[in-house]
Amino acid sequence: MAKAKFERTKPHVNIGTIGHVDHGKTTLTAAITKVLHDKFPNLNESRAFDQIDNAPEERQRGITINISHVEYQTEKRHYAHVDAPGHADYIKNMITGAAQMDGAILVVAATDGPMPQTREHVLLARQVGVPYILVALNKSDAVDDEELLELVEMEVRELLAAQEFDEDAPVVRVSALKALEGDAKWVESVTQLMDAVDESIPAPVRETDKPFLMPVEDVFTITGRGTVVTGRVERGVVNVNEEVEIVGIRQTTTKTTVTGVEMFRKLLDQGQAGDNVGLLLRGIKREDVERGQVVIKPGTTTPHTEFEGQVYILSKDEGGRHTPFFNNYRPQFYFRTTDVTGVVTLPEGTEMVMPGDNTNISVTLIQPVAMDEGLRFAIREGGRTVGAGRVVKIIK
């Protein structure tokens, strides 16, 4: 039995299963955990189908999503795998960013070929910036005709190419059900799939390698030392004595130097992505900085007031609006740590947006917000979440 020891040094990769309902996403997820458990028992728990299928509810930006998280390891990597069983859950997950993916396994039943949701999922994956897709051609045990399998494979490759994904991506013929039943040939197919995942999904850029950014959550004064801003470092690293800029919300940019980094009341040389820190800032008064601004590596992010967003609007049952909204709708847009009012312009030809819809809108904010394409936000009315979205394009 191959023994792989648990190493925290293994690269960590976030992946998920996507594809049409009933093509076997959840069964495949269960099969992967079983096959890897049998291969590396000390590294992996086996998860039964119904444990994954009964996806727990999660709240992300005020939206309830049913989503399952499983984790497993191959020899090379540690994976966190998300499976959103329902089609609506998948769409909500993609738009709200509840679980971001470094790559996805597109599950296509060989018996059906690509179906409408297959196309929709691939399109959404492109829109939200999933970097890589490879394919599990599931239920391949149920198709005897080699030509038919080749035809389905060709169709899937065309679909990937149409959305600018790698059309030479691995397409692995699997049978999740047979693998779960322990059929040796199909167990091997799942092993091959995971080898392909290891090899083809590129290693993600670590958050610490990106330029520094920290949203300001709180500001206070320490007598005799100066002003401290606290927050969770979103990306990058900040070192003591480095120059930073404070941007967003106000019209002007403030330059300053970090004279101290503190975490759990201890002084550090640096703060990095994921850390909850306090930054001591030189020459800054309490009123010079406020919640909702961001502290950044100089010149790496600019505040904007106009953008196009892709949004999901909560249905009435989800606690959203009971009525549609129209052009010039004025809700608050919650970015990172604060609400900013914005005016909505609907796409040409769209008269109104109904609760439960997903659509693209243009927004003009009354204050600038530091943003990049891909940044997530919630849409709120008086503190109640009515939708969620992501910045697709910055206009101004």
UniProtKB/Swiss-Prot annotation:
Query: What segment(s) does the record annotate as region G3?
Result: 83-86
The ranges of region (G5) come to 175-177
- The segments labelled G1 in the record are 19-26
Listed GO MF terms: GTP binding; GTPase activity; translation elongation factor activity
Highest rank taxon of the organism:
Bacteria
Q: What class of enzyme is it?
A: hydrolase
An example Gene Ontology CC term for this record: cytosol
Residues annotated as binding GTP are: 19-26, 83-87, 138-141
Q: Where in the cell is it found?
A: Cytoplasm
- Where is each tr-type G domain found? 10-205
| UniProt family annotation | Belongs to the TRAFAC class translation factor GTPase superfamily. Classic translation factor GTPase family. EF-Tu/EF-1A subfamily.
Q: Which HAMAP family match?
A: EF_Tu_B
- Subunit relationships: Monomer.
**What's the protein called, per UniProt?**
Elongation factor Tu
Say which species the protein is native to: Mycobacterium leprae (strain TN)
What gene name is given for the protein in this entry? tuf
